[in-house]
Every structure is written in structure tokens, then in C-alpha cells.
A protein has these predicted regions:
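C-terminal accessory/binding modules appended to enzymatic or scaffolding proteins
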Residues: 14, 18, 325-329, 493-527, ...
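Short beta-alpha connecting loops at secondary-structure transitions
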Residues: 24, 61, 357-364, 387, ...
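Accessory alpha-helical DNA-binding modules that contact the DNA backbone or grooves
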Residues: 36-37, 52-117, 121-147, 151-152, ...
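Duplex nucleic acid-engaging cores and interfaces of nucleic-acid transaction enzymes
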Residues: 52-58, 65-334, 338-429, 433-441, ...
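Long, charge-rich intrinsically disordered scaffolds of nucleic-acid metabolism proteins
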Residues: 89, 102, 106, 418-419, ...
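Long, charged amphipathic helices and adjacent flexible linkers at domain junctions
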Residues: 298-305, 310-315, 469-500, 608-654
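Single-stranded RNA-binding regions, centering on S1/OB-family and related RNA-binding modules
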Residues: 561-807
Length: 807
């Protein structure tokens, strides 16, 4: 038995990626040898001829899929061979199948299954009748069937024989691999997903109101809309129907699919006695078997495509959050807001060490506002606090006001307040690692510590939490657990290794994400560090228990040792390339002269240092790294300057131009914090004069942006914003650009939005960026005329975020 070789897998991947087969082959060999994607992308550029991390991740996914396909192909060949039905033609078809779906189509007639009506009919000797009627439509069906009536075989009469023959033909039609493949693609290209509200669910399912009478082609449905409708169905609000094509004017006329089935088997109405029966059989096969089977396939394809896109968005948002600008080594006061239980307070010094904790009760029911301000001021003064990090959960607005009053009352402290996502903080607080890291602290206070540290270094703190708990995705609880975890783990791995890790200060969870390490080795590194003191060289890592040559090769370049024996250990230059640097240093007059000297480095000819092991890409990377060794690729920390006097929703006026922070990006737009405790929405159509397909092309979480207020709805706490600062409130086209066909009911399409879940679902599924609200700003602008349009409500309705009770 033969199957396509690994080489054919590599050639297919190369074709899909648009690269050379030898590049794929080299990458596959490295992956199979235990190398990680970050290591290959950074340190094996010559081998892969410059494949980057994104290409390698795609390659890794395709390799997994194609290997699973080959395993399944082998199993199918073995199964069919055991049945004694493996002809040369069938083998060729199985070996030529390029997708799992095509392979299963071919295998369907041979797949072990429970006894069907068709099998029972065959056992009763009715297959010759079926073959005869299909081969000779001139025969009158009922008359021909009379000869096959046999009560002893369970065939009571001629009609029963005819029913058995129909079952045999229907199964045959529905198991024709080529026919099924053709109909599947036709259905995908022509079909649409329709939704109707279930009777009596109008009020209870109001958040899905955009889908109460809705239909859209499969190929045009964005992921968030598919997931919204599937959730509406799951919650018992919507009935979904897969329509193979647009409804016909004459419902009794055969569909194009029935015509295709009939044509495939030479069935046509030529006035012969058997034609009508055969056409009815083709229709019956389509409606009772093929359409059901393809409906399951298409639904699965819709869900898979929607999940893939949602996972992509989740991963992209997570990447932005992890790579957000770190505030750095600045003493920070963390506030974990709460009402009855109080605001938990934690002060961490410049290194992240907890130096003080407390609980204050500024809000209801105790209302100890002034006393809370005094306590916070004393803590800030005693520990030279520079930043105040406020969690964005319950009571965050009120606690943000407390911080604003603290800044106003004590300008000498020179504090800056920043709203920080607290998503996942409670998960961390109750985790085993938190109890090991902060054993002396009550669980309730650990969240405040995490909030403060997130501002100092988002990446180092967020890696302690399961990525799914960070919550920056759409419909994340509706997604495949395996698919989501695999994608998010890859993002965390890429981010951690892209930034690099200080081996002498990193936590075990952070070390565990470094290439080649894992949780077990991470614990061993920390234990070795605790027992023997800080590492003074990368070579000393080899003394760590169970850290062998392969692990050392994979991790060494990503681990930094600052102030150690060798200055190169603080850079991303891999130890295996140190001889190259020594040669450079010899030419320049020493390593110390070389490092950080842009002029000296630029005077060197990279080509002169290329050898049989290290090519030009690696040498060029080394020169770039030596210019700024250990550089942090993350952006510089800055916060938005909110306008003074604009602190609550009622302070906003249409026409104001404000600075704000992007807190979350969804498929339909971006949410922006402008300092009034309620995020505004920039719809995707208000981001640019040009068409924007993906809002992330324009902004990402954490970006500082200038926005214009287009409309304010205080009753519903809705703010409509635009990035197009020349838009005018009340002018058609301002803030929201209409596109043909949007917003139609009964087969129309809402604008790019979420549907089910509403704003609350978005907020739960979208964490704020680490840096958000700052408390100081400039003067207040002139009042603008009241809005004359309803652009904001329109955008929110189309996004599925409107409260229907207030329509």
C-alpha cells in the first residue's frame, strides 16, 4: 500500500505559501527535530531562506493538517482493502484526494454503517430491479416491481419492491463522490443562511433582533454574524435554515440541484413510463439525503471559517495587549475597585516587589471618601509612587474619580492615573502560582498587585494567566477549545521570545514561554537561581537540572543576563554566533568598543564575516543587535491627555475633538476611551475616507488617537465618534458611511457587527489595553450644535448593540 510521500506534502505547502520546496523541507526538518518557531525564525534564517514567524506558523498548521490527511488516507485504504473492494481506479482516487472532505466523499460508500433501508433492500434481492429501472426507463416501474414481491424476504408487494429499489438508488446517488463534491461547492457559492425568530421569543431574545428576519449568502457572512446567529439558535431564540439557493418563483419546479442529480445518472423526462419515477427518485435523494448531508457540511464549514476568523482576531488583539508599552521601573499604586468590599490597594516598587497593601472604602455603603484620599496620598508619598493603575471592572468609574481627586488634591506628588484591564486578575489571584508568589497576601489583595504590575510590564504579568481568561476575543466561549488554545499559545510564545527575558528576574510562567523551556525546566531555573544566586553567564544555564544541549540551543538566545561576565549575554546574539562577534571585535579593537557604537558597526562590511555556518542574514542581524543590544521592540510608554473639564458623559458635546485610547477592536469598529467612564464607538465606516475591511488595519488596542464626537445619547450612554476629524455632526455621511444594501430587513444584512451579546458581550469579550485613562489635559472646546442625525444609534443598531427596549 502506498500513500503520497512527505515530499508531496512539502510541495503542496510550498505551493500554498508561495515559497520554494527546499525552504519548506528545511523548516519541516527543524520542526521535527524539536526546534520552535521563534528559534527557527530568529536563528535559522539561512536554512529556511528567511521564512518569517508568520509563514512558519502557517506552515506548521498546514503540516499538521496534511499529516492528519495522510493518516486518514492510510486508514481508508486499509479499510477498503480489507473489504476486498480496492480497485486500481479507487486507489488512484483516494490517493489523489487533496482535502479531508474529498477523501470522506470517496470513502462514504465503503464506510461501515448501520443497516440502512438500501442494504435491507439489497439483501431482499431488489438491486437488479433498481438497476433495471435506471438502465431502462421504458419499463413501467410498478409492473416491473411485481416480479420482485416476496413476502418471505420481507417484500410484501410490488409497491414495497419499488420502495426498496428507490432506497437503493437514493443511496447510490448520495454516495457518488464527484456529484457530492460538485453539489457542495454549488451550495457554498449559491446558498444562504436564513434566520427567523422563534414564536414568542421576540422580547427575551431582543439582543438578536437584527436576525429576526434575515438572510445572507454563505460567502458574504462575516465571522461575527455567523457566531451571533449560532448563539441565537443555541439560546432558543432563532431558527436557522440553510437555503441551497434563492427561493424559486415556482416552488414545485425542480431545483438546480435535483436537475444536477438527475443529469449525473442520465435521468430525463422523455415521456417514457419510468421517467417520472426516476425523476421523483432523484428529487427524493436530494431532499432526504444529499441536502441533509451537505447542510451538515456547510454548517460545519461556516462555523469553522467563523471560528478561524474569530481566533485570528482574538490572537491579534492578544498580541497587541502583550506587546503594549511597558511603563517600566516606576513605583506604582494598584487599585482593584469595589463597592461593599472596598477598593483593594497595593503598592509595588520599581522592581515589582510588593511594599504596601491596604483596603479603602470610598464608595457606598461606607462613603469614606476623604479618609481614602488621605490613605492613598500617604502611601504614594511614602513609596515615591509615580503611577496609579486602576482596574476597569466594577466600581472603576467611581474609583477613577477618586484617583482624579487624589491628583487634584496633591499636585506635588506628580501622579499619573491609568485605567488598566483587570481581565483575568481574579483567575490569577486564586491560582496556585499566585499563592506561591504572594503567599502572605490575601486572595483579594493579589488582584491589586497584578493590576499594578500589568502597567509596569504587561507581558511579564499577563503570561501568568491562561490567555483565554484575558478576554480580548469575540464569542470566545463559542470557539473550539483546542483551536483557540493552540493559536493563543503560539501568540504568547512569539511575543515572549520576540521581547526576550531577563533570566535573573523572570517568573516561572514567563520562563516557561521561552523557546525550548516549558514549565518543568522553568521551575528548575528558578530553583537553581534561588539556591545559587543570579546567573552570571549563559553558560551557567547548562548547570540547571535537566537543561540539556537541545534545550540550551533553543533558549539561550532569548534569555538575557544583564551585568554578567559577558556583555553579549545581555543581547539577542546566540552563543553559537559569539565567534563571529569575536572576529568583528578583533577588527574593531575589542567587544566593548564594538557594542553600542553605531559608527564602528556601520564601518564593518557584513560580507567579510560570512562563513560556512553563518550567512549574510545572521551577520546582518548581529550587527543590528550590537548597535542596541537587548533592545525592547515594544513602543515607548505614553498615555492619552484627556481634556480638562470633560469627565462625564454630560460634559461631551458634538463637534469636540478629543484625545483617547483604543480599548478594544472588533469587526465592526473600535471602542475608544475619551475619559468619561464610557467608551465611544468609532464605526468601521468612520475610520477613513477609504474603504476599511478590517478595523485593525487602522487602529489596535492601546493606540492613542484623536477623535471627533459626532453624537451623544446620554439616556442610553452611547457615544458616536469618528477618526475623520473633518466630519461634521448632523451632516449626512458624517461619522457613519452608508453602503448599499446594509441594514435591510428580511434578507438584508446588518452592518458589520456582533449581533447577539450586545455591548455587554463585547466588553466581556474585549479587555482594555494596559494604558488608558490619564487625568490631566488641556482646556475645553467650544460647544457644537446639537446633533441632527442618529448616526450613533444607527451604527450601534447595525452592530447589534442597541437596547431594543429603547428603540
Amino acid at each position: 500500500m502506498t500513500t503520497p510521500s512527505t515530499g508531496s506534502i512539502e510541495s503542496r505547502i510550498a505551493e500554498q505559501l508561495g515559497v520554494r520546496e527546499r525552504q519548506v523541507r528545511a523548516a519541516v526538518e527543524l520542526l521535527d527535530g524539536g526546534a520552535t518557531v521563534p528559534f527557527i525564525a530568529r536563528y535559522r534564517k539561512e536554512a529556511t531562506e528567511m521564512l518569517d514567524d508568520a509563514q512558519l506558523r502557517t506552515l506548521e498548521e498546514r503540516l499538521r493538517y496534511l499529516r492528519e490527511l495522510e493518516e486518514r488516507r492510510s486508514a481508508v485504504l486499509e479499510s477498503v482493502a480489507e473489504q476486498g473492494k480496492l480497485t486500481d481506479e479507487l486507489r488512484a482516487a483516494i490517493e489523489a484526494a487533496e482535502t479531508k472532505a474529498r477523501l470522506e466523499d470517496i470513502y462514504l460508500p465503503f464506510k461501515p454503517k448501520r443497516r440502512t433501508k438500501a442494504q435491507i433492500a439489497k439483501e431482499a434481492g431488489l438491486e437488479p430491479l433498481a438497476d433495471g429501472l435506471l438502465g431502462d426507463p421504458s419499463a413501467e416501474p410498478l409492473s416491473a416491481a411485481a416480479a420482485f414481491a416476496d413476502p418471505e424476504k420481507g417484500v410484501a408487494d410490488a409497491q414495497a419492491a419499488l420502495d426498496g429499489a428507490r432506497a437503493i438508488l437514493a443511496e447510490r446517488f448520495s454516495e457518488d463522490a464527484d456529484l457530492i463534491g460538485t453539489l457542495r461547492e454549488r451550495m457554498w457559492g449559491r446558498g444562504r443562511l436564513a434566520a427567523k425568530v422563534r414564536e414568542g421569543q421576540e422580547e427575551a431574545g431582543a439582543k438578536f433582533s437584527d436576525y429576526f428576519d434575515f438572510a445572507e449568502p454563505f460567502t458574504e457572512l462575516p465571522s461575527h454574524r455567523v457566531l451571533a446567529m449560532l448563539r441565537g439558535e443555541k439560546e432558543g431564540v432563532l431558527d436557522l435554515n440553510l437555503e441551497p439557493e434563492e427561493p424559486q418563483a415556482d416552488p414545485s419546479a425542480p431545483s438546480s440541484y435535483e436537475v444536477e442529480v438527475a443529469s449525473r445518472f442520465g435521468i430525463a423526462d422523455r415521456g417514457r413510463p419510468g421517467d417520472r419515477w426516476l425523476l421523483d427518485t432523484a428529487r427524493w435523494a436530494w431532499r432526504t439525503r444529499i441536502m441533509v448531508h451537505l447542510g451538515i457540511d456547510v454548517r460545519s464549514r461556516l462555523r469553522t471559517a467563523a471560528e478561524d476568523e474569530a481566533v485570528r482576531v482574538f490572537a491579534a488583539n492578544l498580541r497587541d495587549l502583550l506587546l503594549a508599552a511597558p511603563a517600566g521601573t516606576r513605583a506604582t499604586l494598584g487599585l482593584d475597585p469595589g463597592f461593599r468590599t472596598g477598593v483593594k490597594v497595593a503598592v509595588v516598587d520599581a522592581t515589582g516587589k510588593v511594599v504596601a497593601t491596604d483596603t479603602v472604602y470610598p464608595h457606598v455603603p461606607r462613603n469614606q471618601w476623604d479618609g481614602s484620599l488621605e490613605k492613598l496620598a500617604a502611601l504614594a508619598r511614602a513609596h515615591q509612587v509615580e503611577l496609579v493603575a486602576i482596574g476597569n471592572g466594577t466600581a472603576s468609574r467611581e474609583t477613577d474619580k477618586l484617583a482624579a481627586d487624589l491628583i487634584a488634591a496633591h499636585p506635588e506628588l506628580k501622579l499619573t492615573k491609568v485605567m488598566v484591564s483587570e481581565a483575568g486578575a481574579s483567575v490569577y489571584s486564586a491560582s496556585e502560582f499566585a499563592s506561591q508568589e504572594l503567599p502572605e497576601l490575601d486572595v483579594s489583595l493579589r488582584g491589586a498587585v497584578s493590576i499594578a504590575r500589568r502597567l509596569q510590564d504587561p507581558l511579564a504579568e499577563l503570561v501568568k494567566i491562561d490567555p483565554k481568561s484575558i478576554g480580548v476575543g469575540q464569542y470566545q466561549h463559542d470557539l473550539s477549545e483546542v483551536k483557540l488554545s493552540r493559536s493563543l499559545d503560539a501568540v504568547v510564545e512569539d511575543c515572549v521570545n520576540g521581547v526576550g527575558v531577563d533570566v535573573n528576574t523572570a517568573s516561572a510562567p514567563l520562563l516557561a514561554r521561552v523557546s525550548g523551556i516549558g514549565s518543568g525546566l522553568a521551575e528548575n531555573i528558578v530553583a537553581h537561581r534561588d539556591s545559587n544566586g543570579p546567573f552570571t553567564s549563559r553558560k551557567a544555564l547548562k548547570d540547571v537540572s535537566r537543561l540539556g544541549p537541545k534545550a540550551y540551543e533553543q533558549c539561550a538566545g532569548f534569555l538575557r543576563i544583564r551585568g554578567g561576565d559577558d556583555p553579549l549575554d545581555a543581547s539577542s546574539v546566540h552563543p553559537e554566533a559569539y565567534p563571529v562577534v569575536r572576529r568583528m571585535a578583533k577588527a574593531a579593537g575589542g567587544v566593548d568598543v564594538l557594542i553600542g557604537s553605531a559608527a564602528t558597526l556601520r564601518s564593518l562590511n557584513a560580507q567579510e564575516f560570512v562563513d560556512e555556518k553563518f550567512g549574510l542574514p545572521t551577520v546582518t542581524d548581529i550587527l543590528r543587535e550590537l548597535e542596541k543590544p537587548g533592545r525592547d521592540p515594544r513602543p515607548a510608554f505614553r498615555t492619552a491627555t484627556f481634556r480638562e473639564g470633560v469627565e462625564k458623559l454630560s460634559d461631551l458635546e458634538a463637534g469636540m475633538v478629543l484625545e483617547g485610547v483604543v480599548t478594544n477592536v472588533a469587526a465592526f469598529g473600535a471602542f475608544v476611551d475619551v475619559g468619561v467612564h464610557q467608551d465611544g464607538l468609532v464605526h468601521v465606516s468612520a475610520m477613513s475616507r477609504n474603504f476599511v475591511k478590517d478595523p485593525r488595519e487602522v487602529v489596535k488596542p492601546g493606540d492613542i488617537v484623536k477623535v471627533k464626537v459626532m453624537e451623544v445619547d446620554a439616556a442610553r450612554k452611547r457615544i458616536s465618534l469618528t477618526l475623520r476629524l473633518d466630519d461634521e455632526p448632523g451632516v449626512a455621511g458624517g461619522g457613519r458611511e452608508r453602503r448599499g444594501g446594509e441594514g435591510r430587513s428580511g434578507g438584508g444584512r446588518p452592518a458589520q457587527g456582533q449581533g447577539g451579546g450586545g455591548r455587554q458581550g463585547e466588553r466581556r469579550g474585549g479587555a482594555r489595553a494596559p494604558q488608558q485613562r490619564q487625568g490631566r489635559g488641556g482646556g475645553r472646546g467650544q460647544s457644537a450644535p446639537p446633533p441632527a442625525n442618529d448616526a450613533m444609534a444607527d451604527a450601534l443598531r447595525r452592530a447589534g448593540l442597541v437596547d431594543p427596549k429603547q428603540r
